[in-house]
């Protein structure tokens, strides 16, 4: 990254975006059936058995709200590119990244973002009945970092790093704490079942950024919460008794929060709390601009991405191994051996665009240079 071209970030915050979008603008500009759209926009919402009208905006929680808001903000990037055509010509790296109503704009100077870009954004939003929040919209130097979509993005000694933001970590731990607090007398196995989806979802979301140290700290915080949960249930028991009852030893790992429960057939099963730190960190590979998964011309590209994703997951590797065994360890095309030293690939027999699935029976492995077979032999 060239610091001369990319130093400052405009962190934009739209004041009450979902509540203030102009209905007139949406009805005039969103390309859909106007009668249906108007009914959606004017339907109102019910709170405590009382109907509230919607004169502006789209109620949060409504099915159409995220789509309508996204379509309302569509075109901002094109507007900025049209207004500042010389920025790219001079290599000044004005870029915009937007997700729903959250967006950032990069620029070469604080003054340029403040006095030229910000007014252009405000003008675009005003046409749609929206305004930037004066308190929450700010311009930040990349060395100081900024939060976006749950991550903190900052330069450390010239290197740009993305980490889970402090606010996002706090929100996650607060959610874990609330679940534990609401289940003081629950069975341990039931508590684990409530926690695991939350732990897994949060860990997967951050698995593409620099998160290893954060994962370790979060695991320690959760362990502390669970120790207090267990100790409060048995105020007359000692620490050793509590550890034996609630925390197991698995292989080389001690203090694993796990419970053993009986099944209806009399067998036992162990339910174990997931550890965030067990989630591998894997860098995200950006999809090529313009790639369309529904366009047959892009099928080889998405096949390659999908195959790499299979290799990166334990479940995917197991499935590929079964396909390899089914083919007797040979290429589906040339019937020559596929080994660790040969370059190989995986593809669908019936393409997903033609209704094919990801089931093992619809997969084939072949040498990288072999043409894939269109169907089973």
Where are these regions (language model features)?
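Short, charged surface segments at domain edges that flank catalytic/cofactor-binding sites
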Residues: 291-333, 357, 361
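Histidine-centered nuclease catalytic patch
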Residues: 335-368, 374
């Amino acid at each position: 990254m060239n610091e001369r071209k990319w130093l400052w970030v405009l962190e934009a915050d739209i004041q009450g975006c979902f509540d203030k979008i102009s209905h007139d603008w949406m009805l005039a500009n969103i390309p859909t059936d106007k009668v249906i759209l108007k009914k959606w926009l004017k339907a109102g919402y019910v709170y405590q058995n009382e109907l509230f009208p919607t004169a502006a905006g789209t109620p949060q929680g409504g099915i159409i709200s995220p789509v309508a808001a996204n379509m309302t903000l569509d075109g901002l990037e094109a507007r900025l590119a049209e207004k500042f055509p010389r920025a790219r010509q001079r290599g000044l790296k004005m870029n915009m990244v937007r997700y729903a109503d959250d967006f950032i704009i990069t620029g070469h100077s604080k003054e340029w973002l403040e006095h030229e870009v910000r007014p252009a954004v405000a003008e675009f939003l005003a046409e749609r009945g929206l305004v930037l929040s004066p308190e929450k919209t700010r311009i930040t130097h990349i060395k100081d970092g900024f939060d976006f979509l749950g991550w903190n993005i900052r330069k450390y000694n010239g290197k740009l790093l993305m980490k889970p933001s402090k606010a996002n970590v706090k929100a996650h731990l607060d959610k874990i704490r609330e679940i534990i607090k609401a289940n003081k007398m629950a069975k341990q196995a039931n508590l684990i079942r409530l926690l695991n989806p939350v732990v897994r979802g949060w860990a997967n979301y951050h698995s593409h950024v620099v998160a290893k140290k954060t994962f370790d700290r979060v695991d320690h915080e959760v362990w502390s919460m669970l120790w207090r949960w267990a100790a409060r249930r048995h105020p007359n028991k000692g620490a050793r008794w509590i550890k034996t009852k609630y925390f197991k030893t698995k292989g080389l790992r001690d203090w694993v929060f796990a419970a053993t429960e009986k099944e209806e057939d009399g067998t036992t099963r162990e339910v174990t709390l997931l550890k965030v730190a067990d989630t591998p960190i894997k860098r995200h590979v950006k999809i090529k601009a313009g790639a369309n998964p529904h366009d047959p011309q892009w099928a080889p590209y998405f096949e390659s991405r999908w195959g790499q994703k299979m290799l990166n997951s334990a479940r995917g590797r197991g499935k590929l191994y079964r396909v390899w065994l089914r083919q007797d360890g040979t290429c589906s095309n040339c019937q020559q051996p596929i080994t660790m030293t040969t370059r190989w690939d995986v593809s669908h027999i019936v393409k997903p665009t033609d209704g094919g699935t990801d089931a093992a029976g619809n997969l084939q492995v072949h040498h990288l240079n072999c043409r894939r077979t269109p169907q089973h032999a």
